[in-house]
Structures are given as C-alpha cells and as structure tokens.
Amino acid sequence: LRRWTRRRTRRHRRGVWALVGDIYSGLLTIVVVGTILVPHLSRLVAARPPSSSQEAADLGVLDLDPGWLVLALTMLLLILGIGPLSRLGPLFLRPHEAAWWLPMPGDRGTLLVPVARVEYLIAATAGAVMGVLPALASAGGWGAAVAWPVLIAAGTCLVLSELITAQVQGRGVTCLRRFLILFGAAACLAGTTFPFPRSMTGNVVVATLAGVLVAAGTLRWRQARLVLGHVRDDGLLTVVARSFGAHVSLLSLDTRAVGRLLSPALPRPAAPSPLRLARIGRRLPRSVRVLTGVAQADWILLRRQPRRLLQIGAGLAVAVLPLLSESVGIPMRALAYLAGGWIATLAVAEPARQAWFDGAADTSWPVSPWLVRVGHLLVPGLFMSAWSLLSLAPAMTSLGAAGAWKALGVVAALALVSGWAWAGAALRSGFRAMPDFAAGLVTSPVGSLPPGLVQMLVEGPDAALVGALATALVACGIAAPTTTVLGIQAAAGAVVILWGVRTNRRAS
C-alpha cells in the first residue's frame, strides 16, 4: 500500500535531489551565518571571575553556572514544546494518506512505523543540536562534544516515546510536563550547589548517563512500536485536519491562527461564574461598568487556560535565570530579559487575540471602541506588573542588601510602570492587521510576499522594545535606577499604551 501511494504521488513531488538541494542550502546558510555571528556571540559571555560566587552570596543572589543554565533552558524549551507536539500527533498522516490508508482493513502499525522512524530521527537530530550548547559550556574536549549531544538526543527520543504513548492511550501530557518541570528545577538547584561537569570524570558520568538513556530509549521505542496499531482512526483524522490547518495558516502567514490550532480546546465551565468584578462596577458610571465588564470577561478567559500561567512562568525563567549567572554577558542578559517578557506578553495577549477573531462581543458594548480597548488593557497590565516585580527581584535584592532604599523604590516603580507597557504591547500584538493578499504580491529575494507583511511581523515586538527597554537596561545593570530613567519609562509606557489602543482601529 505504501508503494502504491508513492507511485500515485511521485509525479507531484520534486524528487530526491530537490530535497538534497534544500538540505545543502540550509546547512550552508547555517555555516555562513554561524561563522559570522560566533565571534560576536562569544563576547556576550563574560569570563567567570573567581570572586563572583562570594559576591553573589553576599547579595543573597544565586550564582548559576552557565552549563546548568543551558540545561534548565533546554528543559524549558521541551516543556513549552510538548503541548503543540501533542496537538499535532505526534503520529500523523498526510491528507491523501489518511484518505487512502485508513479505510483499508488490516493493522495500522505497519503503516505508522515509517512515520515514527522519521519522527525519531528528527527528535534525535534536534536533541543533538541542542546538546552542542552544554558541550560548549563544559569545554570538556571531544568527550563532552560526543556525550552531551547523545545525552540530549536520547532524552528527546524518550519524550517522543511518551508523547506517542499518550496519543495511543488518549491521555494528556500533564504528567510528562510535570516531570520536565521538576527536572528543570533540579538543574537550577544543582547549579547552585555543584559545579558543571568539565573534568574527565564528569565526562565519564555524562557518557554513562547517556548510555543509560539510550538503552531506555531503545526499550521505550520497542514498547511504543507494539501499540502503534491501536491508534484510533478518529484521532488520526483529527490530527490530519489540525496539521493541514496549521500548514495553511503558515502559508497565509497567520500566526494567530497557528497558535489557535496548536492550543487545546477551552474546558466547558462547570458552574456559572460569580462575576465579582462586574458586580462591583454595577453601581458605577457606564464607562467604568464597561471597563470592569471587559476585564471580567478577559479574566474568565485566562482562568480557563491554565497553560497561560505556565507560559508566564516560562517567560519569567527566561528573563531571570541569566541574571543569576555571573558568566552571562550584559548584552545577553538584556536580550534574555526582553525575550522572556515577550513570551509572557504573548500569554496575556490571548483576550486581545480572541477579540480580533470574534469582534461581536466588543461591538455590543454601549461605548466607544477605544474605551473597550482600554478595558482589554486591565488584566494584562495587572499580570505583567506582577511579572515585572518578580523579574526585577534580583536587582531589588541587591539594592536592599546594599541599603539603597531610594533606588529600590525606583526599581519597584519601574516594574509597575513597565507592566502596563507590556500590556500595551500585548494589545498591539493581538489586534495587528493581516497582510492584504488581494493587493498584489511584492517580489523579494525570498519569493513573492504580500504588502504589509513586515508591518504585521513587527507589530507587537516593536512596542515591547520601546516600552521595556529602559527597565531591561536597569535589570541588567547597564543603567542606574534613577528618577530620570523612571520618567523615560513612564513616557515610553504611555506611548506604547496609546500605540496599542490605536492599532488596527478598523477591526473594532
């Protein structure tokens, strides 16, 4: 049956040499870009001073080794990735394969084994690439260069086996996610106590652990192979439709639709909501009642999506962990802080995205559209203000230990002000306009693109950069926490909030 499918679809394929050419072009691009960026990226990691651990201990701040930091961030990447992977299968078929194969009698296992093999190959390759980072951090020579990629590759294959088992059994990935969270937390705790394995003995321990994981991965693959035929057809058809929808959304450059497809369905409410916030504003003026009503709806939407809280925590980890390592350069800390803030902002931007998908609820309010937009700022502003306070905890701890109470107050005010700037960026990202494919395509070196593509891609990140740059500079130690910086942050936050309220006003 597989041979018949290949014959039927052969004329629609580009051929093996086209695939080889794509792989060659991709590898050549990676090599050229890496050769250009490596000398500059190496400057972002500072030399580890011998007294850094003692100074960090005096300030009450943890000092993480960069190797353990890389491992923790790798676990964080896996934690964020298993949700979308479980939505896409991981076992899946192409639409024509599902149409031709599933109606046939017989065992599904032999049809899905080649798919699983390719996915294991992709998982092992991705794990080996991620394993290069801890190998570079350990500076342990060829032993570390081999042991760490094998270790991470075996770990990703084990994660894939658990995802396949969860798909076959029809259960969620909550247990797997909790295990990865515990493992990442253990890496952070180990970084505060034990040095990263750099010696020959450490490389032997890593190689032994890699061998154990390879054996466990092989055993889990054999177990998963036996149950591949138990995958339900309706589950495969659902995955096929979801994968095809994600592919079409990527072709149309609609990242919001991709995120909606990869997100789990909202749970149905078990009981009516008490609507406490809306009840409080019942006796207030109409404009205030609308603000509280919009905020109440946004809070209900976020409360029904617990994964958003996990995403906010992941953004906090990305922003804070580099601040706890003395070996990470200041520019890299600033980039990590902005990246972590953007990850958290995407989580709290869900109400704005939902309002963009279905604007009927916003148009039903008896006030101006801009006031409804302001209501969508309240819940993200509160969440991101709390996030900013937690992200600036290392800086506030250092200032408190030094007795700089005025600077400590400025940092706390910066956190509160920057939280509303992040909320404005969330509003701008959620309500951004789509490119107009009907207006004709623009020829570019990477192909024909619709007008307005660049504007769509930068709407949101541009506001985040403008609104949070001052706070990021203070968090990384580049700028001192002064009232001048606070004034700059307040002005930038006001601009970003106005920016977000006025973004794509025609959609309201």
Please annotate each region the language model reported:
Residues W101-L102:
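Alpha-helical transmembrane segments that serve as single-pass membrane anchors or pore-forming helices
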Residues L1-A98, D107-A360, S368-S508:
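Hydrophobic alpha-helical transmembrane segments of membrane proteins
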